[in-house]
Amino acid sequence: NVNYLVSDYLAEITMSIMARARARDEKLGYATDFIQDLIVPNLSEINRKGIKIISNAGGVNPLACAEIVENLIAEAGLNLKVATILGDDLITQIEELSDQNYEEMYSNERFPEKDNILSVNAYLGAFPIASALQDGSDIIITGRSVDSAVTLGACIYEFGWSPEDVDQLAGGSLAGHILECGTQATGGNFTDWQDSIDNLVDIGYPVAEV
């Protein structure tokens, strides 16, 4: 039985692509394939089996993404609770951030000119996801969360971990990173793959036990 279905859609380049989409249309800026490929074809099954959905598909516009999901739920006559986790979008603080003269930690490159910035985002963690689950949410959509947070948030809620349970949180984080890497964790990043398998078409996905 599936209890949680989690998905990670974001990378730094993805955020810039989504920011450009939002600049063209204020209703865009999220992962549209989350709607088309996950929600639309599976909504009735998600409802029937009580599967919790956790995703950072909100990108730079999680409210717009959540609105689409809520409309689909209403059209289907279902009673599912959607939660949106915000706080990563710092674009309104661009003036303040520019004035701080921040430097990139490795290259010492100065903070970019504000006119050249499409989006500014902080990484959200897993505890807000756990709180949303505690509140009874069925579908949780975040902006730029840590890649592993979609898995770790479910673990925190399921096992009742606290911020002091650092060993357990480390294990949940590791599981989350392995799972979100998908086939990269099962040989997709292996330089000499041709010496061990015939091709990369069907190399399988990782399994993590917490």
Summary of predicted features, one role per range:
Residues 130-164:
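Charge-patterned, long linear interaction tracts outside catalytic cores
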Residues 6, 140, 207-209:
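Structured core elements
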Residues 98-106:
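Surface-exposed loop and adjacent secondary-structure segments within mature catalytic domains
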Residues 53-54, 58, 140-141, 145, ...:
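Long, contiguous hydrophobic alpha-helical segments, chiefly transmembrane helices and signal peptides
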Residues 30, 74-90, 94, 151-198:
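Catalytic or ion-translocation cores adjacent to nucleophile or general acid/base/metal-coordination motifs
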Residues 10-12, 146-147, 185:
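Short, glycine-/Ser/Thr-/acidic-enriched flexible segments
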Residues 37-47, 116-133, 168-210:
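Polyanion-binding loop/helix "lid" in catalytic or ligand-binding cores
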Residues 1-97, 109-123, 128, 134, ...:
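Metallocofactor- and cofactor-centric catalytic cores in central/energy metabolism, strongly enriched
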